[in-house]
Amino acid sequence: MLTLLRLDSSPLETSVSRALTDEFVAAWKAAHPDGVVIVRDLTLAPPPPVDAVWIGACFTPPPQRTAEQNDRLALSDAFLEELERADEYAIGVAMHNFSIPAVLKLWIDQVVRVGRTFAYSDGRPQGLLQGKKATILAATGGVYSAGTPAEGMNFLDPYLKTVLGFLGVRDIQVVTAGGTSQLRNPDVDREAFLEPVLQRVRETAA
């Protein structure tokens, strides 16, 4: 039985990135009717930033951790269980100031953990999330695709691909709805604007 982890990071319920993850999940469930979907909306309970206790706990063998250290890692452990359980990830992300939303960065800091999502072998890091698939479902107000003048300002999917690759995820797809600032124009039909992107989402999820 396949399992999909859906991550949402936009604070807006009507955001384009959520429309993309909605469409991905619907198409994925149609293709995998017996599959399980784990939903993690990071905006409902934003992860806290890591602190000295958290860092110390990560580098302390589990049997030697204090109650405070175990408590500090509890949320991270829950995130990691979802990552390890899932076969595929659907990551909904809107571009914020040329990169990812702060809440998604907080989640990343909680899940990049030595001994859980990566380890060192012969002095080199090795990702432990092998055999997983990820789809980055991005929404950007401007257009930052390859060959455009603003291409070099896109730190969203290059960063996420770097993080996922570091953790061992090699099968990564990116579907981007670019130029979404046009939707602020009342003369632009949202459904017609998004349909070509949603079609790519459906094809990717199937």
Swiss-Prot record:
Keyword Flavoprotein: yes
Database matches in InterPro entries: Flavodoxin_fold, Flavoprotein-like_sf, FMN-dep_NADH:Q_OxRdtase_AzoR1, NADH:quinone_OxRdtase_FMN_depd
GO terms, molecular function: electron transfer activity; FMN binding; oxidoreductase activity, acting on NAD(P)H as acceptor; oxidoreductase activity, acting on NAD(P)H, quinone or similar compound as acceptor
Reactions catalysed: 2 a quinone + NADH + H(+) = 2 a 1,4-benzosemiquinone + NAD(+); N,N-dimethyl-1,4-phenylenediamine + anthranilate + 2 NAD(+) = 2-(4-dimethylaminophenyl)diazenylbenzoate + 2 NADH + 2 H(+)
Cofactor(s) demanded: FMN
Domain of life: Bacteria
EC number(s) reported in the record: 1.6.5.-, 1.7.1.17
Binding, FMN: S10, S15, V16, S17
Cofactor binding note of this UniProt entry: Binds 1 FMN per subunit.
Signal peptide: none
Keyword Oxidoreductase set for record: yes
Keywords: Flavoprotein, FMN, NAD, Oxidoreductase
Assembly description: Homodimer.
Similarity field: Belongs to the azoreductase type 1 family.
Function per UniProt: Quinone reductase that provides resistance to thiol-specific stress caused by electrophilic quinones. Also exhibits azoreductase activity. Catalyzes the reductive cleavage of the azo bond in aromatic azo compounds to the corresponding amines.
Full protein name: FMN-dependent NADH:quinone oxidoreductase
Species name: Acidobacterium capsulatum (strain ATCC 51196 / DSM 11244 / BCRC 80197 / JCM 7670 / NBRC 15755 / NCIMB 13165 / 161)
